[in-house]
Amino acid sequence: IAQFPWLPEPFEMDGISQVKKGANLNENPYPQCVSINNKYIYDIPKGANGYSMSNVVVTLSHELGHFLGLYHAFNQLLNGNTNSNEDSDYCTDTPPYNKYRYDVALTNYLTYYGDITSTTSDGYKEFVMRTNSKTGEQFRSTNIMDYAVSDANAFTTQQAERVKYILHHAVFVPGPKDYTGTDFTTTRNSTSDFRFTPQFIE
């Protein structure tokens, strides 16, 4: 699970909430962090061709992507519904696909054949492929912000641009910042009318 970043006014980005001018950052009651379930922390694939859908290295990279402003690479509405053909990650260079339909097929496969544990298996070769919901074309899943069976070893150019923008401007994200034109405080003795709301995503 990860918290999405916050951008201080006047900085803005599609899909990212703003801290309004005059806000006190000390009034944020929610942790700005990434959390990994320790049930999976030791789940690392074995051998050169080993594979696990809950690989902790990929999971951590994925959750850090959310922390730095990235949405899932598949179609997902704000209410969590994945049975959609809407491209919802604010990056036009990530091919969209209907995750609900994909999951139905994958679940049926796993129920009948069991876990996919090798990148050379027929199951991996079949389910690493996706169908673009806009064009109908097949593509290989390589994006770290995808789920399930995926190479999970790449970000796109637009995803990298989003991350750079967040690194340069977001509050609660470590590093040097450009806060030109912003107006917020971090003093413990002042209050503001702005209220933080949680923005968690898995």
Where are these regions (language model features)?
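Extracellular (secreted or membrane-anchored) zinc-dependent metallopeptidases
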Residues: 1-61, 67-202
